[in-house]
Amino acid sequence: MACLFHWTSYLLRWYIGGRIPLGNGHETMLFLAGFLLLCTCIWQRRFSFLLPAGLLLSGFTLLVAYLSEMNPQITPLMPVLLSPWLSLHVSLIMVSYALFALMCLCSILALSIRRHAWQRQRLTLFCRVLLYPAVLCLGIGIFIGAVWANVSWGSYWAWDPKEVWALITFMLYGCLLYTSPSPR
């Protein structure tokens, strides 16, 4: 029910604003929380621990969105931010970050389980399964962000902190992907 309510309000924000609501930090955090809720709803039947964990992660994301200095108002964007490349770039990056957050939570749970080895193995396998789409979305998101930056600013890469840390994250998780055995 929370997922349905959240996505309904997100779609209303899209309708009222007349644009995809990914143009500022507040809207990006709303998308991240919504995707975490969606993942939780999809996988909670198979992994019962995911319901409280996903709701907690989504709730913290919404808390950050509403208690921070980010502007929650629906405002018109600068023309450079109205590009469909930007919406695709931001949504892919946020999807990857949501999957990484779920992986982190599952890894912490797997490390805390002492008695049941089968649960630990199941959590580890779930993390490995999440790793593939997370790295793929992050890589494609970085590439599309570079294309958007070139179209908008005239340069593919500017070495600002967001770009650098996204690249570092991609490289670290890419190494993990390269060294981990494939899921069966």
Region spans (language model):
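A loop-to-helix transmembrane entry motif
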Residues: 23, 129-136, 157-167
